[in-house]
Amino acid sequence: MYSGLNTIWVLLGAALVFFMQAGFSMCEAGFTRAKNTGNILMKNLMDFCIGTPCFWLIGFGIMFGAGNSVIGWLDPGIVKDYGHILPSGVPLWAFAIFQTVFCATSATIVSGAMAERTKFSAYCIYSACISLLIYPISGHWIWGGGWLSQMGFHDFAGSTAVHMVGGVCALIGAKMLGPRIGKYGKDGRPRAILGHNLTFAALGVFILWFCWFGFNGASTVAMDSDAAVTSAGLIFFNTNLAAAVACCVTLIFTWIRYGKPDVSMTYNAALAGLVGITAGCDAVSPLGSAIMGAVFGVVIVLAVEFFDKVARIDDPVGAISVHGVCGALGTVMTGLFATGISTEKGLFYGGGFHFLGVQSLGVVSVAAYVAVIITIVFSILKKTIGLRVDAEEEIAGLDVTEHGLLTAYAGFAMSPDTITDDSTPVAVAGETPVAEAIPVKKVPAFTDGSPKFTKIEVICKEARLDALKNAMTAIGITGMTVSHVLGCGVQKGKPEYYRGIPVEATLLPKVQVDIVVSKVPVRTVVETAKKVLYTGHIGDGKIFVYDVENVVKVRTGEEGYAALQDD
């Protein structure tokens, strides 16, 4: 007898977990460069589309079949009886789609850590391998009646089964792939490669946070009893609390560590809290959830810094730290904070070391298994079709080289990519003999007694543009050209950080005002501009003065002073 309430609950959860693909897409696109956006979105689409038939044909049977404690059975198309594993009142196909979207989540985690330099063909193949074998076998150990579940291992919604599996694959993949071009200087120090759209990343975080209520909440797979309803309420509350506390702690920690609260790290902290609490959201109290969230908030920062600076593993989005490290840590910490309502009591609640030991064993076992299998997969790909694109393709961007897509932002001007490989030695200019030097011809600005033309170029803050225009009008300047530019000075100010790495050069928005004068004294223009722009702070601007040989008005053909006059 099926339960309509339970089935709707499971299907609603499946829909929410499916929509996490949109959240992952936005996060990964925002944390990476614009030239790879189309590739990122394509990968997140295809790992789901490839993973779905793979899990249907092979993965589901391996994961939930009643084979043995290590592996299920081979059941192409899901045609056998799964009554031994189905939740009460939930039909097979509802349970199957719920598990399919979980499998796709694990596969998509890898995309971010290997972004911007992976061959699309290789990505499609290893995504299939994750859905066919890697995720289902470890999932059988945990959720399919395998040896870990028989020992009492508790991973309620997948801190280890989903997230750590994806995180370990991401770790091995990013290590074997190598860092992006320009990520590390010749001295080995990491360089900040800024994400192109943190607005996208923020939207992705909110989508994921919203969908996580389905990811964790619907894992009760029931809502037809007081116990199930009570458990769902606790799960929702703990899920939200851990993420919120993690964000607050990361904000404070980065504020102290870097001098300012780090935006991208705080985004990562939200996901770290969600990932970490997933294993024990049904088993810990709100106090335990808050403490765990605080730990995740500190650990995520230290983990990102470790992989960037010590391990030198280039992870553009922090997937290894968020899903791998915090997924493992959250599973182990469940062995500390479990209150006994749905599992054994944790160490801090008088349960002793047994449950903590089981949790730790499960994490280590799954990590080791996944690391071995995915290393084999990546090694085969590397030796055959190749894992990484060529340097020229990487520099040009994967949108155009992998997909023939000129840009994902048609109609928008894109900022040039200024990160390059500085490992190639640069030729040092030496002295040239006088006999070989190019002759310098000095031409006087004016030779016929005509008026002198001078170009005055003013670089200033955008906020001072109106004041400058008004001041120029007041002294008789009626023509100017205004350009929006990016730039930075040579002065050394307070360092800025992106994901814990000092940003080498920050290009700030400025305006460039070009004025050509003849009768208005140059000194008057310069002094007026100085008076208007001066604040006494770094960044007031610069004024450049040039001689102009001639001026030509295109429409009339007039030259010299006449070309400067209004009609």
Show which residues each predicted segment covers:
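Glycine- and aromatic-enriched membrane alpha-helices
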Residues: 1-446
